[in-house]
From Swiss-Prot:
GO terms for biological process: cell division; cell wall organization; peptidoglycan biosynthetic process; regulation of cell shape. HAMAP family: MraY. The keyword NADP does not apply. Pfam families: Glycos_transf_4, MraY_sig1. Coiled coil: none annotated. Catalyzes the initial step of the lipid cycle reactions in the biosynthesis of the cell wall peptidoglycan: transfers peptidoglycan precursor phospho-MurNAc-pentapeptide from UDP-MurNAc-pentapeptide onto the lipid carrier undecaprenyl phosphate, yielding undecaprenyl-pyrophosphoryl-MurNAc-pentapeptide, known as lipid I. Its cofactor is Mg(2+). Its main location: membrane. It is an enzyme of class 2 (transferase). This is Phospho-N-acetylmuramoyl-pentapeptide-transferase. It is a multi-pass membrane protein.
Length: 326
Protein backbone atom coordinates (compact mmCIF):
# COMPACT_ATOMS: atom_id res chain seq x y z
CA UNK A 1 0.00 0.00 0.00
CA UNK A 2 2.84 2.39 0.88
CA UNK A 3 4.46 1.73 -2.49
CA UNK A 4 1.21 2.52 -4.33
CA UNK A 5 0.68 5.76 -2.39
CA UNK A 6 4.29 6.73 -3.08
CA UNK A 7 3.71 6.15 -6.80
CA UNK A 8 0.74 8.51 -6.66
CA UNK A 9 2.79 11.19 -4.90
CA UNK A 10 5.64 10.91 -7.42
CA UNK A 11 3.22 11.16 -10.36
CA UNK A 12 1.55 14.17 -8.75
CA UNK A 13 4.89 15.95 -8.37
CA UNK A 14 6.05 15.07 -11.88
CA UNK A 15 2.82 16.42 -13.35
CA UNK A 16 3.02 19.51 -11.16
CA UNK A 17 6.45 20.25 -12.62
CA UNK A 18 5.75 19.01 -16.13
CA UNK A 19 2.61 20.99 -16.93
CA UNK A 20 4.16 24.49 -16.48
CA UNK A 21 7.10 23.41 -18.66
CA UNK A 22 4.64 22.12 -21.26
CA UNK A 23 2.66 25.38 -21.24
CA UNK A 24 5.86 27.40 -21.55
CA UNK A 25 6.99 25.30 -24.51
CA UNK A 26 3.56 25.71 -26.08
CA UNK A 27 3.74 29.49 -25.79
CA UNK A 28 7.35 29.83 -26.95
CA UNK A 29 6.70 27.66 -29.98
CA UNK A 30 3.67 29.85 -30.76
CA UNK A 31 1.49 26.80 -31.21
CA UNK A 32 -2.17 27.56 -31.82
CA UNK A 33 -4.13 26.26 -28.86
CA UNK A 34 -7.64 24.95 -28.41
CA UNK A 35 -10.13 26.05 -31.05
CA UNK A 36 -13.65 26.85 -29.86
CA UNK A 37 -16.52 25.71 -32.08
CA UNK A 38 -19.25 25.74 -29.43
CA UNK A 39 -22.25 28.05 -29.07
CA UNK A 40 -21.49 28.76 -25.40
CA UNK A 41 -20.39 32.40 -25.44
CA UNK A 42 -18.35 32.20 -22.24
CA UNK A 43 -16.16 29.55 -23.86
CA UNK A 44 -14.90 31.85 -26.60
CA UNK A 45 -12.43 33.40 -24.16
CA UNK A 46 -10.75 29.99 -23.92
CA UNK A 47 -9.66 30.02 -27.56
CA UNK A 48 -5.92 29.54 -27.80
CA UNK A 49 -5.56 27.76 -24.45
CA UNK A 50 -2.83 25.09 -24.69
CA UNK A 51 -4.22 21.61 -25.20
CA UNK A 52 -2.76 18.08 -25.19
CA UNK A 53 -1.79 18.52 -21.52
CA UNK A 54 -3.00 14.97 -20.92
CA UNK A 55 0.25 13.86 -22.50
CA UNK A 56 2.11 14.95 -19.35
CA UNK A 57 0.05 13.11 -16.72
CA UNK A 58 -0.29 10.12 -19.05
CA UNK A 59 3.47 9.72 -19.53
CA UNK A 60 4.10 10.30 -15.82
CA UNK A 61 1.50 7.75 -14.71
CA UNK A 62 2.54 5.09 -17.22
CA UNK A 63 6.28 5.40 -16.57
CA UNK A 64 5.93 5.53 -12.77
CA UNK A 65 3.46 2.63 -12.74
CA UNK A 66 5.70 0.50 -14.96
CA UNK A 67 8.91 1.18 -13.05
CA UNK A 68 7.38 0.78 -9.58
CA UNK A 69 5.53 -2.38 -10.64
CA UNK A 70 8.74 -3.77 -12.15
CA UNK A 71 10.94 -3.17 -9.12
CA UNK A 72 8.26 -4.20 -6.61
CA UNK A 73 7.52 -7.40 -8.58
CA UNK A 74 3.95 -6.33 -9.35
CA UNK A 75 4.29 -6.18 -13.13
CA UNK A 76 1.36 -8.52 -13.70
CA UNK A 77 -0.76 -9.14 -16.76
CA UNK A 78 -3.36 -6.81 -15.26
CA UNK A 79 -0.87 -3.96 -14.98
CA UNK A 80 0.52 -4.62 -18.44
CA UNK A 81 -2.85 -4.58 -20.19
CA UNK A 82 -4.14 -1.50 -18.35
CA UNK A 83 -0.94 0.35 -19.28
CA UNK A 84 -1.30 -0.94 -22.83
CA UNK A 85 -4.78 0.54 -23.13
CA UNK A 86 -3.54 3.82 -21.67
CA UNK A 87 -0.71 4.01 -24.19
CA UNK A 88 -2.65 2.89 -27.26
CA UNK A 89 -5.76 4.98 -26.62
CA UNK A 90 -3.48 7.85 -25.65
CA UNK A 91 -1.75 7.52 -29.02
CA UNK A 92 -5.10 7.61 -30.81
CA UNK A 93 -5.96 10.79 -28.93
CA UNK A 94 -2.50 12.24 -29.58
CA UNK A 95 -2.89 11.69 -33.32
CA UNK A 96 -6.34 13.28 -33.22
CA UNK A 97 -5.01 16.31 -31.32
CA UNK A 98 -1.93 16.55 -33.55
CA UNK A 99 -4.06 16.81 -36.68
CA UNK A 100 -6.21 19.50 -35.08
CA UNK A 101 -3.41 21.60 -33.61
CA UNK A 102 -0.50 21.16 -36.00
CA UNK A 103 -2.21 20.25 -39.27
CA UNK A 104 -5.19 22.58 -38.73
CA UNK A 105 -7.66 19.80 -39.55
CA UNK A 106 -10.60 20.78 -37.33
CA UNK A 107 -12.10 17.30 -37.34
CA UNK A 108 -8.81 15.58 -36.52
CA UNK A 109 -9.21 11.88 -37.18
CA UNK A 110 -12.51 11.19 -38.90
CA UNK A 111 -14.93 8.98 -36.93
CA UNK A 112 -14.14 5.85 -38.96
CA UNK A 113 -10.39 6.23 -38.48
CA UNK A 114 -10.75 6.83 -34.75
CA UNK A 115 -13.14 3.89 -34.33
CA UNK A 116 -10.87 1.56 -36.31
CA UNK A 117 -7.86 2.39 -34.11
CA UNK A 118 -9.89 2.02 -30.92
CA UNK A 119 -11.26 -1.34 -32.07
CA UNK A 120 -7.75 -2.51 -32.96
CA UNK A 121 -6.61 -1.71 -29.44
CA UNK A 122 -9.61 -3.54 -28.03
CA UNK A 123 -8.92 -6.67 -30.09
CA UNK A 124 -5.27 -6.76 -28.96
CA UNK A 125 -6.40 -6.24 -25.36
CA UNK A 126 -8.79 -9.20 -25.63
CA UNK A 127 -6.27 -11.51 -27.30
CA UNK A 128 -3.49 -10.97 -24.78
CA UNK A 129 -5.42 -10.33 -21.60
CA UNK A 130 -5.45 -13.38 -19.31
CA UNK A 131 -8.68 -12.76 -17.46
CA UNK A 132 -9.46 -16.40 -16.65
CA UNK A 133 -12.46 -17.03 -18.85
CA UNK A 134 -15.21 -15.18 -20.65
CA UNK A 135 -17.52 -14.69 -17.69
CA UNK A 136 -19.30 -11.39 -17.22
CA UNK A 137 -20.14 -10.41 -13.65
CA UNK A 138 -23.55 -8.76 -13.28
CA UNK A 139 -24.56 -7.86 -9.72
CA UNK A 140 -22.64 -10.85 -8.40
CA UNK A 141 -24.06 -13.30 -10.95
CA UNK A 142 -21.71 -14.85 -13.50
CA UNK A 143 -22.88 -14.90 -17.12
CA UNK A 144 -20.88 -16.98 -19.59
CA UNK A 145 -20.52 -15.05 -22.85
CA UNK A 146 -18.04 -17.30 -24.61
CA UNK A 147 -16.79 -15.80 -27.86
CA UNK A 148 -19.26 -12.94 -27.47
CA UNK A 149 -17.17 -11.53 -24.64
CA UNK A 150 -14.94 -9.92 -27.27
CA UNK A 151 -17.97 -8.01 -28.58
CA UNK A 152 -18.68 -6.79 -25.07
CA UNK A 153 -15.02 -5.89 -24.46
CA UNK A 154 -14.83 -3.82 -27.64
CA UNK A 155 -18.10 -2.06 -26.87
CA UNK A 156 -16.96 -1.37 -23.30
CA UNK A 157 -13.54 -0.01 -24.19
CA UNK A 158 -14.60 2.11 -27.15
CA UNK A 159 -17.83 3.27 -25.52
CA UNK A 160 -16.31 4.54 -22.29
CA UNK A 161 -13.26 5.95 -24.04
CA UNK A 162 -15.53 8.17 -26.10
CA UNK A 163 -17.84 8.85 -23.15
CA UNK A 164 -15.05 10.40 -21.07
CA UNK A 165 -14.00 12.33 -24.16
CA UNK A 166 -17.50 13.85 -24.35
CA UNK A 167 -17.38 14.71 -20.65
CA UNK A 168 -14.20 16.73 -21.10
CA UNK A 169 -16.02 19.91 -22.09
CA UNK A 170 -15.56 22.39 -19.25
CA UNK A 171 -12.68 23.22 -16.93
CA UNK A 172 -11.88 20.45 -14.48
CA UNK A 173 -14.98 18.35 -15.12
CA UNK A 174 -13.41 15.24 -16.61
CA UNK A 175 -10.25 15.22 -14.49
CA UNK A 176 -11.99 15.18 -11.10
CA UNK A 177 -14.84 12.97 -12.34
CA UNK A 178 -12.24 10.36 -13.27
CA UNK A 179 -10.44 10.84 -9.93
CA UNK A 180 -13.73 10.00 -8.19
CA UNK A 181 -14.31 6.94 -10.39
CA UNK A 182 -10.75 5.71 -9.93
CA UNK A 183 -11.03 6.19 -6.17
CA UNK A 184 -14.03 3.85 -6.12
CA UNK A 185 -12.11 1.26 -8.11
CA UNK A 186 -9.17 1.76 -5.78
CA UNK A 187 -11.38 0.65 -2.88
CA UNK A 188 -12.57 -2.37 -4.86
CA UNK A 189 -9.01 -3.31 -5.81
CA UNK A 190 -7.88 -2.97 -2.19
CA UNK A 191 -10.72 -5.14 -0.87
CA UNK A 192 -9.96 -7.77 -3.52
CA UNK A 193 -6.28 -7.66 -2.59
CA UNK A 194 -5.26 -6.64 -6.11
CA UNK A 195 -2.45 -4.29 -5.13
CA UNK A 196 -1.04 -4.32 -8.66
CA UNK A 197 -4.17 -2.65 -10.01
CA UNK A 198 -4.29 -0.30 -7.01
CA UNK A 199 -0.77 0.84 -7.91
CA UNK A 200 -1.82 1.97 -11.40
CA UNK A 201 -4.98 3.58 -10.04
CA UNK A 202 -3.16 5.67 -7.42
CA UNK A 203 -0.47 6.66 -9.90
CA UNK A 204 -3.11 8.03 -12.28
CA UNK A 205 -5.01 9.76 -9.47
CA UNK A 206 -1.79 11.53 -8.54
CA UNK A 207 -1.28 12.66 -12.12
CA UNK A 208 -4.85 13.92 -12.45
CA UNK A 209 -4.68 15.88 -9.20
CA UNK A 210 -1.46 17.49 -10.38
CA UNK A 211 -3.12 18.31 -13.70
CA UNK A 212 -6.19 19.77 -12.00
CA UNK A 213 -4.02 22.46 -10.39
CA UNK A 214 -3.75 23.95 -13.89
CA UNK A 215 -7.05 22.71 -15.34
CA UNK A 216 -9.59 24.17 -12.90
CA UNK A 217 -11.38 27.32 -13.99
CA UNK A 218 -9.88 29.38 -15.51
CA UNK A 219 -7.98 26.54 -17.14
CA UNK A 220 -4.40 27.18 -18.17
CA UNK A 221 -4.31 23.93 -20.11
CA UNK A 222 -6.71 21.28 -21.45
CA UNK A 223 -6.04 17.54 -21.45
CA UNK A 224 -7.09 17.04 -25.06
CA UNK A 225 -8.14 13.75 -26.61
CA UNK A 226 -4.76 12.27 -25.66
CA UNK A 227 -5.91 12.43 -22.05
CA UNK A 228 -9.65 11.81 -22.23
CA UNK A 229 -9.61 8.83 -24.62
CA UNK A 230 -6.91 7.14 -22.55
CA UNK A 231 -8.76 7.71 -19.27
CA UNK A 232 -12.02 6.27 -20.58
CA UNK A 233 -10.26 3.19 -21.89
CA UNK A 234 -8.48 2.82 -18.57
CA UNK A 235 -11.72 2.84 -16.59
CA UNK A 236 -13.21 0.16 -18.85
CA UNK A 237 -10.06 -1.98 -18.62
CA UNK A 238 -9.97 -1.70 -14.82
CA UNK A 239 -13.62 -2.72 -14.48
CA UNK A 240 -12.86 -5.84 -16.54
CA UNK A 241 -9.63 -6.59 -14.68
CA UNK A 242 -11.52 -6.49 -11.38
CA UNK A 243 -14.35 -8.63 -12.83
CA UNK A 244 -16.80 -5.89 -11.86
CA UNK A 245 -17.82 -4.67 -15.29
CA UNK A 246 -21.36 -3.74 -14.31
CA UNK A 247 -20.12 -1.28 -11.70
CA UNK A 248 -18.92 1.13 -14.38
CA UNK A 249 -22.52 1.83 -15.37
CA UNK A 250 -23.06 3.33 -11.91
CA UNK A 251 -19.58 4.57 -11.01
CA UNK A 252 -19.40 6.08 -14.49
CA UNK A 253 -22.94 7.49 -14.45
CA UNK A 254 -21.64 10.94 -15.40
CA UNK A 255 -20.08 9.61 -18.61
CA UNK A 256 -23.15 7.50 -19.35
CA UNK A 257 -25.41 10.53 -18.87
CA UNK A 258 -23.24 12.73 -21.09
CA UNK A 259 -23.20 10.15 -23.88
CA UNK A 260 -26.88 9.32 -23.60
CA UNK A 261 -27.78 13.01 -23.82
CA UNK A 262 -25.97 13.27 -27.16
CA UNK A 263 -27.66 10.14 -28.52
CA UNK A 264 -31.10 11.33 -27.37
CA UNK A 265 -30.55 14.79 -28.82
CA UNK A 266 -29.46 13.52 -32.23
CA UNK A 267 -32.26 10.94 -32.45
CA UNK A 268 -34.97 13.37 -31.34
CA UNK A 269 -33.67 16.05 -33.69
CA UNK A 270 -33.93 13.69 -36.67
CA UNK A 271 -37.33 12.28 -35.70
CA UNK A 272 -38.96 15.68 -35.10
CA UNK A 273 -37.36 17.55 -37.94
CA UNK A 274 -35.23 19.89 -35.88
CA UNK A 275 -36.59 19.93 -32.31
CA UNK A 276 -34.30 19.47 -29.32
CA UNK A 277 -34.62 17.92 -25.87
CA UNK A 278 -31.68 19.83 -24.40
CA UNK A 279 -30.43 23.34 -25.07
CA UNK A 280 -27.11 21.82 -26.08
CA UNK A 281 -25.25 18.55 -25.70
CA UNK A 282 -23.24 17.01 -24.13
CA UNK A 283 -25.62 17.86 -21.31
CA UNK A 284 -23.15 19.85 -19.20
CA UNK A 285 -23.59 22.63 -21.78
CA UNK A 286 -27.36 22.48 -21.23
CA UNK A 287 -26.81 23.34 -17.57
CA UNK A 288 -24.36 26.08 -18.49
CA UNK A 289 -26.94 27.74 -20.71
CA UNK A 290 -30.00 27.48 -18.48
CA UNK A 291 -29.61 25.41 -15.32
CA UNK A 292 -31.37 22.09 -14.75
CA UNK A 293 -34.44 23.02 -16.78
CA UNK A 294 -32.47 24.71 -19.51
CA UNK A 295 -34.75 27.72 -19.14
CA UNK A 296 -33.45 29.17 -15.88
CA UNK A 297 -30.39 31.18 -15.03
CA UNK A 298 -27.13 29.95 -16.56
CA UNK A 299 -24.89 27.93 -14.29
CA UNK A 300 -21.25 28.83 -13.83
CA UNK A 301 -18.69 26.21 -14.78
CA UNK A 302 -17.89 25.68 -11.09
CA UNK A 303 -21.56 24.98 -10.35
CA UNK A 304 -21.78 22.50 -13.21
CA UNK A 305 -18.57 20.88 -12.02
CA UNK A 306 -19.75 20.45 -8.44
CA UNK A 307 -23.11 19.11 -9.59
CA UNK A 308 -21.53 16.42 -11.75
CA UNK A 309 -18.82 15.63 -9.21
CA UNK A 310 -21.51 15.25 -6.57
CA UNK A 311 -23.51 12.89 -8.79
CA UNK A 312 -20.37 10.87 -9.51
CA UNK A 313 -19.44 10.69 -5.83
CA UNK A 314 -22.92 9.56 -4.76
CA UNK A 315 -22.99 6.96 -7.54
CA UNK A 316 -19.58 5.64 -6.48
CA UNK A 317 -20.64 5.40 -2.83
CA UNK A 318 -23.85 3.64 -3.89
CA UNK A 319 -21.84 1.11 -5.87
CA UNK A 320 -19.55 0.38 -2.92
CA UNK A 321 -22.60 0.03 -0.66
CA UNK A 322 -24.18 -2.47 -3.07
CA UNK A 323 -20.95 -4.47 -3.18
CA UNK A 324 -20.01 -4.52 0.49
CA UNK A 325 -23.07 -3.74 2.62
CA UNK A 326 -25.27 -6.55 1.39
Amino acid sequence: MFISISAGIVTFLLTLVGIPAFIQFYRKAQITGQQMHEDVKQHQAKAGTPTMGGLIFLIAAVVVSFLVALFSKQLTNNVGMILFILVLYGLVGFLDDFLKVFRKINEGLNPKQKLALQLLGGVIFYLFYERGGDMLSIFGYQVHLGIFYIVFALFWLVGFSNAVNLTDGIDGLASISVVISLSAYGVIAYVQGQMDILLVILAMIGGLLGFFVFNHKPAKVFMGDVGSLALGGMLAAISMALHQEWTLLIIGIVYVFETTSVMMQVSYFKLTGGKRIFRMTPVHHHFELGGLSGKGNPWSEWKVDFFFWGVGLLASLLTLAILYLR
